[in-house]
């Protein structure tokens, strides 16, 4: 059993992942921003901690994670687009602080939900609305790769609301394929149970290969913009 903290615990993917992790015998601590979300999160089997992680310092996060006794941290949060300033603040700065805090608190595992193609070589123009997000995620991912954490980078393609198939395709060339949020949740659960995914980047879409088999066959690649 592991003690797993989920950042962005009330997000769609996090709420789908929580009962899967609990069913596997893990203790899940879900970090949420609003008190009124507590009952729903507890109903999924997690412990709810109402703290705005995005506003906490590295030191405050370290104390929070240490008090929770975390072995692993899952980043499943995001600014949600729109305001570039908030995007930098959440998707880069807060994400990096949680990595540093996890390491300082003694957590060893970190799973980042990024996106397919995330890279410092993204080539998105600075005047493009997508630039703040692309650059923020790329810098956060790069920071994680340089840490001492046992990290896994997940790069789902465009998210959809399809029912879970439990099958994916590991690829950095998605075409028009999508990745259902329910399958992303299952991938989070699966990589946390599979040590062979440590220090690997896994870009994926929905596909025809069972998740456990697909992630178990991923070569040792550390980027989400390389074909697999």
Task: Please give the residue ranges for each predicted region.
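Structural motif
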Residues: 3, 71-72, 109
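N-terminal Rossmann NAD(P)H-binding glycine-rich loop of SDR-like oxidoreductase domains
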Residues: 2-26
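Glycine/proline-rich active-site loop of Rossmann-fold NAD(P)-dependent oxidoreductases
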Residues: 122, 163-168, 191-200
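Alpha-helical substrate-binding/gating segment
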Residues: 180-201, 205-228
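NAD(P)H-binding glycine-rich loop region in Rossmannoid oxidoreductase-like domains
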Residues: 30-97, 101-104, 192-196
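Substrate-positioning beta->alpha
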Residues: 95, 136, 154, 174-190, ...
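Conserved Rossmann-fold NAD(P)-dependent oxidoreductase catalytic core, especially the SDR/UDP-sugar
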Residues: 27-29, 35, 79-146, 152
């Amino acid at each position: 059993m592991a003690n797993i903290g989920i950042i962005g615990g009330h997000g769609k993917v996090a709420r789908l992942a929580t009962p899967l992790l609990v069913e596997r015998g893990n203790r899940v601590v879900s970090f949420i921003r609003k008190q009124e979300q507590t009952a729903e999160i507890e109903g999924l089997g997690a412990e709810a901690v109402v703290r705005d992680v995005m506003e906490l310092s590295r030191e405050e996060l370290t104390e929070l994670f240490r008090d929770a006794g975390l072995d692993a941290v899952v980043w499943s949060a995001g600014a949600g687009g729109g305001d570039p300033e908030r995007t930098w603040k959440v998707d880069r700065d807060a994400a990096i602080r949680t990595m540093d805090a996890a390491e300082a608190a003694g957590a060893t595992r970190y799973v980042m939900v990024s996106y397919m193609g995330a890279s410092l070589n993204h080539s998105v123009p600075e005047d493009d609305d997508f630039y703040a997000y692309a650059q923020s995620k790329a810098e956060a991912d790069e920071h994680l790769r340089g840490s001492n954490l046992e990290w896994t980078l997940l790069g789902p393609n465009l998210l959809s609301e399809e029912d879970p198939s439990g099958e994916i395709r590991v690829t950095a060339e998605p075409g028009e394929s999508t990745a259902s949020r329910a399958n992303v949740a299952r991938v989070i659960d699966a990589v946390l149970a599979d040590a062979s995914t440590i220090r690997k980047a896994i870009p994926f879409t929905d596909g025809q290969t069972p998740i456990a088999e697909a992630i178990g066959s991923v070569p040792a690649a550390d980027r989400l913009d390389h074909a697999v």
